[in-house]
Regions:
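Enriched for short, Lys/Arg-rich terminal
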Residues: 1-9, 18, 22-32, 36, ...
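Short coil-to-helix segment of the ABC ATPase nucleotide-binding domain corresponding to the Q-loop/switch region
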Residues: 13-14
Length: 94
């Protein structure tokens, strides 16, 4: 587990990167919010802005932060990396 406050490495799944590219072309305000959430996640993965919450059931081990009412940033911590899983829509439990 990372040491609190230590800057993590950032990686993306292909689907998450496609989500991010979507926001680059569609909504700069949402993109700015995602960037702020990621910056905070890199320093404090389990607390901070966006109401971080651990996910359950088949998404156990993943975390979610609110981008807005509809969209979530979903990520996990893998060794010393923050892995972004999604940054568009809601996660799909079950």
């Amino acid at each position: 587990m990372p040491i609190e406050g230590k800057l993590l490495r950032l990686t993306w799944t292909l689907a998450a990167w496609e989500d991010y590219e979507y926001w680059q072309g569609q909504d700069r305000k949402t993109l700015k919010r995602i960037n702020s959430l990621i910056k905070d996640c890199l320093r404090h993965p389990f607390e901070g802005i966006g109401k971080p919450e651990p996910l359950k059931e088949n998404l156990s081990g993943f975390w979610s932060r609110r981008i807005d009412d509809t969209h979530r940033l979903v990520y996990c911590i893998d060794a010393q990396a923050l892995v972004v899983i999604a940054c568009r829509y809601h996660y799909q439990p079950g």
